[in-house]
Amino acid sequence: MAKLYFYYAAMNAGKSTVLLQSSYNYRERGMQTLLFTPAIDTRFQYGTICSRIGLSEQAYAFNNSDNLYVLTQEFQLQTQKYSCVLIDEAQFLTREQVYQLTEITDQMSIPVLAYGLRTDFRGELFPGSQFLLAWADELIELKTICHCGRKAIMNMRIDENGQAVIEGEQVLIGGNESYVATCRLHYKRGEAGKTFPRNKLFNKDTNTF
């Protein structure tokens, strides 16, 4: 029986990386996958899911008015049966679109894997995450860490000076320059800690073996 899965985490936990790996695992075995990404996410090339470690894959960029159930039916008529549907940045789904994902699972018997944030920078649920938490068959937490080494569960919005921002619109598209994942304690204190440039993370000179 197909299920709806919600993989949730704080920022920079590798959600898109896990999504792309899952899609690759299906395709490696000759199975078709359908990937969706929200058109509102303008961090990368339009209609592309990109991970922080450099993996990328084309996806259908959807808007809030799109019916994901109908789109999946239409796309499947053009290709062989999909073995899995994968959703990136699922926190941006509407209530209706989360219901449509349950229809893909229940009526079309296709597993749906949705990946997204649980809460915004104020510690409040996104609409998409709220209904995924309520309706998904399986909830899986992807873990990342705070600068102190504890598990990070909060998403802190920061300004250009690295200071915590506590007011503003719920949606502000950004990456490491706008958000940092922290534990609850450092979220309360407004302490973002320090992040490192990507080239420092992959510097071969830092490896001693």
Curated annotation (Swiss-Prot):
GO-annotated biological processes: DNA biosynthetic process; thymidine metabolic process
Catalytic activity: thymidine + ATP = dTMP + ADP + H(+)
Active-site positions on this chain: 89
Keywords recorded for this protein, A-Z: ATP-binding, Cytoplasm, DNA synthesis, Kinase, Metal-binding, Nucleotide-binding, Transferase, Zinc
PROSITE patterns in UniProt: TK_CELLULAR_TYPE
Subcellular location: Cytoplasm
Gene3D superfamilies: 3.30.60.20, P-loop containing nucleotide triphosphate hydrolases (3.40.50.300)
Entry EC number(s): 2.7.1.21
Residues that, per the record, bind ATP: 9-16, 88-91
Protein name, UniProt field: Thymidine kinase
Species in which this protein is naturally found: Legionella pneumophila (strain Paris)
